[in-house]
């Protein structure tokens, strides 16, 4: 429920660089934080999609604040890396008495109009040579997580719905030959083609 980082920590979700989406709730949490910050489903979907699609990182907790990965006043930073375990243990001890997990969030995903905007952005970037075809495939899978792709109407979702959407997108991408090739290239130190 709280994050403790070293002052030089780099925070971000970079999985799209090898053709998959973040697993384990990364897309859900990013969307949730953008939605809470803006109160607007379209903005939250667009910011989450751009951030995860480009694999944006904050080179420090301060920079990660702009990406909603670090929450000042809630999360903490230590200057000395050697103090991480000691401070984390103290945080846990302080949180433990009377601890209850947060209520599972409910979120609203925007309708498919924003999906069309995302698709047009990727098509334009592909035509200009900014992206490879599989970048578009990966980006549009991220979009399926944060947009109601079946209707123009907003869609209320639970945390579990978001986990299910993430898992489905991850598995679809993991089965593609392009993602397999990108992962193999990364593991062997070769350039991603």
Model-identified regions with their sequence ranges:
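CoA-thioester-processing core
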Residues: 1, 5-40
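Residue-level detector of family-conserved "landmark" positions at structurally sensitive sites
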Residues: 7, 74-75
């Amino acid at each position: 429920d709280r994050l403790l980082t070293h002052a030089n920590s780099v925070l971000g979700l970079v999985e799209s660089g090898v053709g998959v989406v973040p697993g384990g709730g990364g897309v859900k949490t990013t969307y949730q934080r953008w939605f809470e910050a803006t109160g607007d489903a379209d903005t939250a979907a667009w910011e989450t999609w751009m951030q995860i699609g480009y694999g944006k990182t904050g080179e420090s907790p301060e920079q990660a604040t702009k990406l909603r990965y670090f929450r000042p006043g809630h999360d903490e930073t230590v200057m000395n890396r050697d103090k991480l375990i000691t401070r984390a243990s103290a945080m846990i001890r302080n949180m433990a008495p009377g601890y209850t997990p947060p209520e599972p969030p409910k979120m609203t995903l925007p309708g498919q109009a924003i999906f069309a905007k995302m698709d047009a952005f990727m098509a334009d970037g592909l035509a200009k040579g900014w992206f490879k075809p599989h970048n578009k495939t990966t980006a549009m899978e991220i979009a399926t997580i944060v947009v109601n792709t079946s209707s123009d109407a907003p869609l209320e979702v639970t945390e579990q719905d978001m986990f299910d959407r993430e898992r489905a997108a991850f598995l679809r991408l993991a089965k593609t030959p392009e993602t397999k090739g990108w992962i193999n290239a990364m593991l062997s130190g070769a350039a991603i083609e």
